[in-house]
Amino acid sequence: MVQHWTDIVFCHWRYEPDVVQRLLPAGVEVDTFDGSAWVGLIPFHMDGLGFPGLAPLPYVGSFPEVNVRTYVRAGNKRGVWFMSLDIDRWLPALVARLGYRIPYCVGDVRHIRLGDRVMSSVHRKWPSARYRSAELSVTVGERSDDDDLSRFLTARWGLVANPFRGRPVWAPVDHPAWSLHAATINELDAGVVAAAGLPYPNDEPHVLYSPGVPVRIGLPTLLTR
């Protein structure tokens, strides 16, 4: 599948590795930086979703998304592990759940940019969760220099998903290097992070913004045990 991720915000918190590991299945290990696991609240706008060489899918090919993710190792692969992905379209949510085994959710989702402000919100309707909402508003700053942490959090070339018959699912993710900017929080409600089974994050987050990148996601395969 090809797509374009636009106006993406990377909002991350440190967690103790064992707190995140207990939410992962056998065969999937939390990846760490500076001794910590990292969990992100990541809003963006998905545009141009479709198949290579064809026109983008009408209606279902463009929508806002807010996901909660961490970083893992499985076999000899390193990638993103999605704890939830909220969108406002039923069809792509169901297709992704079946085809890629990743936990898409459906509800009212908003993601807009006005000048240097980026604002996102989630009110989840399906499946139900104790904490079903999130709000995030940031002000975009100057271009940010690349460093080891920003590369750890953003330079990920695959996704790992729920095992099938005991083997984790892997799909390659290809995109250019991110153009990253500093960003400051104006408003934050991380309820969907708590809904994933984690303690509510109270520490100051690490925040970055990018105008976006074109993305190609390959077909899912099963990793060897």
Q: Could you tell me what each predicted segment is?
A:
Residues V2-D7:
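Terminal, regulation- and interaction-focused segments at domain boundaries
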Residues M1, E16-V66:
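Glycine/small-residue-rich interface belts in oligomeric ring/scaffold proteins
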